Curated annotation (Swiss-Prot):
The lineage of its organism: Eukaryota, Viridiplantae, Streptophyta, Embryophyta, Tracheophyta. Belongs to the CDC6/cdc18 family. GO terms for molecular function: ATP hydrolysis activity; DNA replication origin binding. CDD domains: AAA (cd00009), Cdc6_C (cd08768). Residues 1-70 are annotated as: Disordered. This is Cell division control protein 6 homolog. InterPro entries: AAA_22, Cdc6/18, Cdc6_C, Cdc6_ORC1-like_ATPase_lid, ORC1/CDC6, P-loop_NTPase, WH-like_DNA-bd_sf, WH_DNA-bd_sf. It comes from Oryza sativa subsp. japonica (Rice). Residues 1-24 have a biased composition (Low complexity). It comes from the Eukaryota. GO terms for cellular component: nucleus.
Length: 515
């Protein structure tokens, strides 16, 4: 085999020097290892199979690209695919990787890999639905309430006057989050207009060891320098400060008192004195109280109304189903992929809106539905990447709105549960409000016969009914004979039906006709 040197010498003797012949060893090696790059060169025949014609045409390399179906698809549809919203992949891997792993001999390892959910993606979804997570898009569905509070604060700052406002509403209606947003808006507005930015103080009354400590926190924010008044209580120091122009602070103070219900004492003195701080002539306090009680200002502050200083009341109404759905969708926008089926979200919104309108409850239900979906994903080997469905949401809602009575029923022994089933059947079929212990025993025996469970004797049956009566499930009357004692159901029969939902054994007991 001739060497490169001899090949070069012979080529120069012949007088026909080709580009390949005069190439250096390094360039020749690069061309040999990159036949795709060399396909467009004049000597492409040296790098192609002798049985196939080289892909050389008028346009050279672009023709080689057009011969690849994959490249053609990427050119034609690449822009369209990129514009689509990416799918949620809860397993963290693509279906192709699952398929390739499934072809391996280690099937146990592959099955464990396929059945495991991606904890990183699950955690991102749960954090987006967490109550403590402040949505980047801002608070939606509370524009009117925020506008009223903001205008109130602006008026106080512009006129350098004190004022009080009371924010009320059911739990989970966005009160605290809205007021925090207003605080930021007030500071931003003051900077833009050249006004002096007011100081801000947020107090959660649940953190106070004693109710009167709230005055110490307010006094510390003003940073008074007078030492002669140290013998006075913090409330007295504030009252003295706001009564004289010389001692009054120059800067306004925005005080936000959350969970104001905890300040309600027997004499209501703390709550009354707190609102009265805004009535002094040289007061610089803008007080905003937040509580769940809608009529707190009417019930606990009658003196304020007589002094013509009743606070402005802003009520946050419970969220509607459309508002709950919109808020959840806004939180999920940061994920850039769909997690819930639309029907599942609508079901959650309708259920929570009908019950309480509590947004925190709705977010908790959605997180629970994701956990149910995650548990199902661990158990299933299906390679399809589904969404959180209506069934997952139904399970989560059942857990969230389950009555404490249901938990008590599920903790009872089997025969006592069967007695409750017999009692529910008796009242359901006969439409009665009461029966006798003897009739209830017949229904119980019929259930035992149909389920092939040995029934207990009459004495033990009577003792079981007495235990159920002591626990509040039923009420037993008095009689000389046990069989004639009146029995009344003390709980809702729907709780019994709901407790045994999905249990085949007790479903059969509840379907039993009256004996």
């Amino acid at each position: 085999m001739p060497t490169l040197r001899s090949a070069t010498a012979s080529a120069s003797t012949a007088g026909t020097a080709s580009p390949t012949a005069i190439a250096t060893p390094r360039s020749a090696k690069r061309r040999l290892t990159s036949p795709r790059r060399a396909a467009g060169s004049p000597d492409a025949s040296q790098f192609t199979s002798p049985h196939k014609s080289p892909n050389v045409g008028i346009v050279g390399t672009p023709k080689l690209l057009s011969a690849s179906p994959r490249s053609s698809r990427k050119r034609l549809y690449g822009d369209f695919v990129a514009a689509e919203k990416p799918k949620w992949n809860p397993r963290g891997k693509s279906p192709e990787s699952h398929f390739s792993r499934a072809q391996s001999s280690d099937w146990d390892l592959t099955k464990e890999f396929i059945c495991s959910a991606d904890p990183a993606q699950m955690q991102v979804v749960k954090e987006a639905l967490h109550v403590a997570t402040v949505p980047s898009c801002g608070l939606v569905c509370r524009d009117d309430e925020q506008s009223r509070v903001l205008e109130f604060c602006k008026g106080c700052v512009e006129q350098e006057r004190s004022g009080s406002l009371y924010v009320c509403g059911c739990p989970g209606t966005g009160k605290t989050l809205s007021i925090n947003k207003v605080k930021e808006s007030v500071a931003r507005w003051a900077d833009e207009t050249g006004m002096e930015t007011p100081d801000a103080l947020s107090i959660n009354c649940t953190s106070l060891a004693k109710t009167h400590e709230i005055f110490s926190k307010i006094l510390a924010k003003f940073q008074t320098r007078k030492k002669a008044t140290c013998k006075l209580s913090p409330l007295q120091q504030l009252q003295t400060m706001f009564s004289h122009k010389e001692s009054a602070p120059r800067r306004m103070l925005l005080v936000v008192v959350d969970e104001m219900d905890y300040l309600i004492t027997r004499d209501r003195a703390v709550l009354h004195d707190l609102f009265m701080l805004t009535t002094y002539q040289f007061s610089r306090c803008i007080l905003i109280g937040i509580a769940n009680a809608i009529d707190l200002a009417d019930r606990f502050l009658p003196k304020l109304e007589s002094l013509n200083c009743k606070p402005l009341v802003v009520t946050f109404r419970a969220y509607s189903k459309d508002q709950i759905s919109d808020i959840i969708k806004h939180r999920l926008k940061v994920l850039e992929y769909d997690v819930f089926e639309p029907l599942a979200l609508e079901f959650c919104a309708r259920k929570v809106a009908a019950a309480s309108g509590d947004m925190r409850k709705a977010l908790g239900v959605c997180r629970s539905a994701v956990e149910v979906f995650e548990a199902r994903l661990q158990e299933s080997s299906d390679q399809e990447f589904g969404l959180v469905t209506f069934d997952h949401m139904d399970i989560a809602l059942s857990k969230a709105f389950k009555s404490p009575v249901v938990d008590s029923i599920l903790c009872l022994p089997q025969h006592q549960q069967m007695v409750l089933c017999a009692l529910a059947n008796t009242f359901h079929h006969c439409k009665k409000k009461a029966t006798t212990l003897g009739e209830l025993n017949k229904s119980y025996i019929e259930i035992c016969r149909s389920t092939q469970v040995p029934a207990v004797g009459m004495l033990e049956f009577s003792n079981m009914c007495m235990v159920l009566s002591d626990q509040g499930f039923m009420k037993l009357g008095q009689s000389k004979e046990d069989k004639l004692r009146r029995v009344m159901l003390q709980i809702d029969s729907s709780d019994i039906t709901f407790a045994f939902k999905g249990n085949r054994f007790f479903q059969k007991c509840l379907e039993q006709q009256k004996f």
